[in-house]
């Protein structure tokens, strides 16, 4: 299989590295490539999704035809790209990887489509961000395996139809509701990736540690797993930070105590909240009495981008019950108050009931 990429709580603490974001693109890519599982046997977690895709793969191979187009949705860092590569490996085809922001002009997507071989997989990340012209070019490509190109303008314009080999489009999105109905309806399979359980993350961490030649105890892996926000990408990143810590401190293995010490330094607490999570919650509590408050108001008060708050931080805060969305806005929950050591639960409960 060939892989091709198209380039295109308390008082506010001192700000530390944000572990929900990449340190450098190259560093992250190198790490992910070195530890990426190559089959569903190696892929930990997402059992229901793996069962479905295993059936789809076997059926497609039996009929000697490509898989149906697949839409994967869920929070970032859960393994959408990895799944597309595993699918390509299982089908014995190439996988071309791109992202919607890189497909600005019609020729960007047409160049990719005409370069596909029979059965190839085209993976488009952030597919909800496709512009209208690019999206409309995909309609006949997905449905009829042809590319409709308009040549000329005005009355002299004419349409040329170019046949395409049968291929599989795998789209990935964090905002499935932002896809247009015509695009969403052309996917034969729509599957959601869920946050991982701490036990699953501990298994991922142990596997990664072995590949990185780093010794780690069961308890050490569990400690990192608990603080990884249900996300393998973050688990692997935290593991690397803890590995740095034990190497500098001259320890031989990652234990629970050392993992906790290291992650406390990076201000990743036992619930997986980092500096920005606590800033968001603290701002909502101190400036907006816990809510309800709109997303734009939170963004303005914290200095964070509204889209980043909504797509990167909110999903986990909602998942663990620290934040609620109401028709009037976001509301901090009682358990979040308790975790941050704040008071004001009675006032919070009044807002929650409205």
Swiss-Prot record:
Region feature Head domain (RuvB-H), mapped onto this chain: 270-354
One family name in Pfam for this protein: RuvB_N
Gene3D superfamilies given in the database record: 1.10.8.60, P-loop containing nucleotide triphosphate hydrolases, Winged helix-like DNA-binding domain superfamily/Winged helix DNA-binding domain
Biased amino acid composition, Polar residues: 1-10
Family annotation (CDD domains): AAA
Any single GO BP term: DNA recombination
Binding site for DNA: 325, 330
Catalytic activity: ATP + H2O = ADP + phosphate + H(+)
Residue ranges, annotated region (Small ATPAse domain (RuvB-S)): 197-267
Domain note: Has 3 domains, the large (RuvB-L) and small ATPase (RuvB-S) domains and the C-terminal head (RuvB-H) domain. The head domain binds DNA, while the ATPase domains jointly bind ATP, ADP or are empty depending on the state of the subunit in the translocation cycle. During a single DNA translocation step the structure of each domain remains the same, but their relative positions change.
Subunit structure: Homohexamer. Forms an RuvA(8)-RuvB(12)-Holliday junction (HJ) complex. HJ DNA is sandwiched between 2 RuvA tetramers; dsDNA enters through RuvA and exits via RuvB. An RuvB hexamer assembles on each DNA strand where it exits the tetramer. Each RuvB hexamer is contacted by two RuvA subunits (via domain III) on 2 adjacent RuvB subunits; this complex drives branch migration. In the full resolvosome a probable DNA-RuvA(4)-RuvB(12)-RuvC(2) complex forms which resolves the HJ.
HAMAP family registered for this protein in UniProt: DNA_HJ_migration_RuvB
Function: The RuvA-RuvB-RuvC complex processes Holliday junction (HJ) DNA during genetic recombination and DNA repair, while the RuvA-RuvB complex plays an important role in the rescue of blocked DNA replication forks via replication fork reversal (RFR). RuvA specifically binds to HJ cruciform DNA, conferring on it an open structure. The RuvB hexamer acts as an ATP-dependent pump, pulling dsDNA into and through the RuvAB complex. RuvB forms 2 homohexamers on either side of HJ DNA bound by 1 or 2 RuvA tetramers; 4 subunits per hexamer contact DNA at a time.
Protein name (Swiss-Prot/TrEMBL): Holliday junction branch migration complex subunit RuvB
């Amino acid at each position: 299989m060939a892989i091709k990429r198209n380039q295109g709580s308390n008082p506010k603490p001192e700000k530390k590295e944000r572990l929900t974001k990449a340190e450098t693109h190259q560093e992250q890519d190198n790490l992910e490539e070195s530890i990426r599982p190559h089959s569903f046997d190696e892929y930990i977690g997402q059992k229901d999704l793996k069962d479905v895709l295993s059936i789809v793969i076997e059926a497609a191979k039996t009929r000697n035809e490509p898989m149906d187009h697949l839409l994967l949705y869920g929070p970032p860092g859960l393994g959408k790209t990895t799944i597309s590569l595993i699918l390509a490996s299982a089908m014995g085809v190439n996988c071309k990887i791109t992202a919607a922001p890189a497909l600005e002009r019609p020729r960007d997507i047409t160049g990719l489509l005409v370069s596909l071989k029979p059965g190839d997989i085209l993976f488009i990340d952030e597919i909800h961000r496709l512009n209208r012209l690019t999206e409309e070019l995909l309609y006949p490509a997905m449905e009829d395996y042809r590319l409709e190109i308009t040549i000329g303008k005005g009355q002299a314009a004419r349409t040329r139809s170019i046949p395409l080999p049968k291929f599989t489009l795998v789209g990935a999105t964090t905002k499935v509701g932002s896809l247009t109905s015509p695009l969403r309806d052309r996917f034969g399979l729509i599957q959601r990736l869920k946050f991982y359980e701490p036990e699953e993350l501990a298994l991922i961490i142990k596997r990664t540690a072995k590949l990185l030649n780093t010794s780690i105890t069961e308890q050490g892996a569990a400690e990192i797993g608990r603080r990884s926000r249900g996300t393998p990408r973050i688990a692997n990143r935290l593991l690397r930070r803890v590995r740095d810590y034990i190497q500098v401190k001259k320890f031989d293995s990652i234990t629970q105590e050392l993992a906790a010490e290291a992650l406390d330094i990076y201000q990743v607490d036992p619930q997986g909240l980092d500096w920005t999570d606590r800033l968001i919650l603290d701002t909502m509590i101190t400036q907006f009495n816990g809510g309800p408050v709109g997303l734009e108001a939170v963004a303005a008060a914290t200095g964070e981008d509204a889209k980043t708050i909504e797509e990167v931080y909110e999903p986990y805060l909602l998942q663990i019950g620290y934040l609620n969305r109401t028709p009037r806005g976001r509301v901090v929950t009682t358990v979040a108050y308790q975790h941050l050591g704040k008071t004001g639960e009675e006032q919070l409960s009044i807002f929650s009931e409205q």
